[in-house]
Amino acid sequence: MLKPIIHKFKYGKHNIILETGVIARQATASVLASMDDTTVLITIVSDNTTIPGQKFFPLVVNYQERTYAAGRIPGGFFRREGRPSENEILISRLIDRPIRPLFPKDFLYEVQIIATVISVNPQINPDIISIIGSSAALCLSGLPFLGPIGAARIGFLNNKYILNPSIEKIKKSSLDLVVSGTKNTIFMVEAEASILSEDNILNAILFGHESQQSLIDNIYLFSDKANKIPNIYKNIYKPDKQIFNLISKKIKKDINKAYYILKKKERLKKLNDIKQKVTSELLNNDSQLTSSKIEESIYFLERNIVRKRILKGKLRIDGRINNEVRKIDVRTGILPRVHGSALFTRGETQALVSATLGTSRDAQNLDDLLGDRTDNFLFHYNFPPYSVGEIGIVGSPKRREIGHGKLAKRSFLAVMPNIEDFPYTIRLVSEITESNGSSSMASVCGASLALMDAGVPIKSAIAGIAMGLIKENDSYIILSDILGDEDYLGDMDFKVSGSRLGITALQMDIKVSGITSDIIRSALYQAKSARLKILDIMENTLQIPRSDISKFAPRIYTIKINPEKIKDVIGKGGSIIRMLTEETGTVIEIKDDGIVKISAINGEKAKYAIKRIQEITEDIQIGKIYSGKVTRILDFGAFVSIGFGKEGLIHISQISNKRIDKVINHLKINQIIFVKVLEVDRQGRIRLSMKNI
């Protein structure tokens, strides 16, 4: 018999239901989590063996949406769900990020979390309940998870913070912030903002963490009610102090010297030489040792050396003080045929960013679970292996690249022009050509310059900075513009982007507990200081958007026609619009409300297309003289075309002031003549005359 264990509670204004014991019972743990009819099935399966030589925690999170959840059938030929969408990948990362740091560093068993959306309320985004359900399932799994964690989405509307706002409210909100953490510590923040102050952001984070306290209490109650599995992984490897001390004695001085080498490439070569030499020596002397044990001890040695140096107030790895930003080089317009381009170099991190302007036909059509939509602003981030001096597979973007592209895109949403004012689809591409930390924020800086170089009228320049943290007990140091090694050996990766007036996006990932509001506040204000310095340097090169778009970009013109005339412009089977596009070399798009967009690389061609459309759609004016072509000759007169789809009759009596016997003696087929409109009757028939012209 199926014996469900159900726990219901209120979370703000929402009803939460956590259930286990009925579905997916073969999994290590499973939870059916619901928030006001948005339901997600969370399953966790863990392996009971490790892969020899495994060096990292192989956690895989797969978030997947089923279209039946929204009462829909998938599009496409196969009519079934395919590879993960960008949104599914982003939410997978959102679930992963607060969970991963809560497993012991030496826990190396493979774990897979699958979150499947099986019912959706169109006003409730499934991401928050997916994090909640994953936290609850992990608490039942018997894995050494140091949770539970909570999750909250915070909006800011009418000067008030809103807990888990609906889809409708979040569209009106000036903030979309997700915060996740344990009872005492925040571990993850993701936010998009409409240029809000540091205090607004900090208060939102604290409000979100405070709000999820009752949620965490209820997950504890649920796990107690469900008789969670005891922790079955008792024999987890712990670092051997004897090995650590031996390695420390042999190479501590050499490692310390290596971390005074300022250039990354030289430093890494020296460190690798030291590591290979000591590893080879120890393995030859002791057959019981493994390379993974040696590597872990070396990691802790490196970590201790770098962290102690910084905490003592000494210079950082590359010789900077804590709040110093690396040397910046800015160049714009470096790609001659590209609509806008910039090369942004910060130390050993470099982004080559291009901006491309397209028409509405280039916009991306998105088939989301919460409804179809069109996106006319795209940001793609590429991280090739050569950027870190490695050989690797080049192919479709990885999760990290998609995540960094999304963060960079969110940095600009508050300053992009309205589609009505600037009717272009905009695509930004950031090629990371060198990387030593903070490449996503270099992409933001480069993108701001590329947009302005392309003549996109953004409201203000945007810059980004990545902050780090070194924390031991109550002592801590916040680092500006972190290197890759400082990210790897440190306790926080805190990316902040914005304008001079405020923050537009941020992403925070914390690896340790004990992060206080004072630490977050200090990081935010230190980031602001760095951001303003970077903006000063950027604005020395390009202060405002260029006054005109590139000569290689399409010119888009917009006109309004009577919606009843749309059929005249399109023609039977699209014949007229096809002829117009071929004749003028333009792209013509017509909306149901009569808005017509004409785009062409050559502005004169676009203007000619406008003239032709106006000729087609303008009403025939009585008494006006038109140039026309004779199309048919009959005994009683001739038909003359005076525009697309507009044909009038000249009666034989209106061809000449004198009496004539035969029309054919005065007019020929395809002859161009001038005619005056005498009348347009109720049926739209046009009567013409050649007299007195």
UniProtKB/Swiss-Prot annotation:
CDD domains in alphabetical order: KH-I_PNPase, RNase_PH_PNPase_1, RNase_PH_PNPase_2, S1_PNPase
Subunit structure: Component of the RNA degradosome, which is a multiprotein complex involved in RNA processing and mRNA degradation.
Name assigned to this protein: Polyribonucleotide nucleotidyltransferase
All copies of domain S1 motif, residue ranges: 623-691
Family under the similarity heading: Belongs to the polyribonucleotide nucleotidyltransferase family.
UniProt-listed Enzyme Commission number(s): 2.7.7.8
GO cellular component assignments: cytosol
Gene transcribed to yield this protein: pnp
UniProt cross-references to InterPro entries, sorted A to Z: ExoRNase_PH_dom1 (IPR001247), ExoRNase_PH_dom2 (IPR015847), ExoRNase_PH_dom2_sf (IPR036345), KH_dom (IPR004087), KH_dom_type_1 (IPR004088), KH_dom_type_1_sf (IPR036612), NA-bd_OB-fold (IPR012340), PNPase (IPR012162)
Top-level enzyme category: transferase
Alphabetical GO biological process terms: mRNA catabolic process; RNA processing
Cofactors, names only: Mg(2+)
Role noted for this protein: Involved in mRNA degradation. Catalyzes the phosphorolysis of single-stranded polyribonucleotides processively in the 3'- to 5'-direction.
Keywords from the UniProt entry: Cytoplasm, Magnesium, Metal-binding, Nucleotidyltransferase, RNA-binding, Transferase
Residue stretches making up the KH domain: 554-613
Catalytic activity from the UniProt record: RNA(n+1) + phosphate = RNA(n) + a ribonucleoside 5'-diphosphate
GO MF, any single term: magnesium ion binding
SMART domains: KH (SM00322), S1 (SM00316)
